[in-house]
Amino acid sequence: VPHDPMQVLQHTLPNGMRLFFSVNKEVPRVYTEIAVRVGSKHDPAETTGLAHYFEHMMFKGTDRLGTLDWNKEKAILDQIEQLFEQHRAETDLAVKKTLYAEIDRLSSEAARFAAANEYDKLVSAMGAKGTNAYTWVEQTVYLNDIPANELERWFQLESERFRRPVLRLFHTELETVFEEYNISQDRDFRKVMKAGQEVLTPTHPYGTQTTLGRGEDLKNPSQTNIYRFFDTYYVPNNMGMVLCGDFDPQEALKLAQQYFGGFAPKPIPAFHFDPQPQLTLRERRDVYGNEAPWVELAWRFPGAGTPEARMLPLLAGMLFNYQAGLFDLNLIQNQQVLEAYAYARVYEDFSSLVLH
């Protein structure tokens, strides 16, 4: 891109995977991201929260990584997958309890063949920092910060990780996700965001489901849906890689082709949604919580790529930028309010401007 201060080099592998490289020789490290263009918007309606808890499972290894005896482990994991499907379909609470007890027993048996935290140990041995991931409405992103001389080993490990993840230690990780969900229920900003999206996009997944999902769905997961989700969206033509730091772009391109070039592309299902009702009247929602009262205003606009969506971040920045926005100068620095800010939420299908 002309006049790009980051001098980002862009390349697309034959299988559709996009690469973004930016060289910076200041320190001998490379910051990495692997992004998948899928998020909670794409969760099946009956298993909301799936994109997020699958992100957690991407740290559990594959049939070659994280196992002590894959054949024995797989036989048990296959049973667990079927039991989760029975558990989800069952309506009798006593039967569900019995099924979950069997899931728990088999999970303990399968754990004997799992090498726990092997991925984390391998990236730690490389000298990686900031190993993490996050899921949002339309993206899931996996992060690392590695020494420059470990780039090929990182490529090798990540290609294995994305080849075919295994849902080992699943129900214990789901308990961690459910605890994250429970904590979020006490956070007023999450409740306000949810209420606002319900008003702005009442029949779109932006307004009908959240990234953390519904509690009842987290209690009734489907491993079959998870594998189907992976097969559908975790494909190279729906993924991008970012490298920034001390590396040779030509060498990185060769490594990307070597380790990710063999991944087979697939057609990505088009996302369809109903037109949202016109917002012709002011609609008020009162949300009750533990924090001091505040007022939030939001307006809906068209989605990413439209002129309106491109203007929203500029408008929000004019209002609030931590230093010289209109809110900064007139409200915060003049001590008229305890807190005030503005931001734009720009999603693919709809955007919004939020004033707080």
Regions found by a protein language model. Name each.
Residues 1-42, 66-149, 183-238, 262-306, ...:
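Non-catalytic beta-strand/loop surface segments
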Residues 160-168, 260-267:
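A common structural junction motif
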Residues 147-150, 245-250:
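Helix N-cap motif at beta-to-alpha junctions
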Residues 43-45, 152-154, 171, 306-309:
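Solvent-exposed, non-transmembrane alpha-helical starts
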Residues 56-66:
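Catalytic Zn2+-binding segment of zinc metalloproteases
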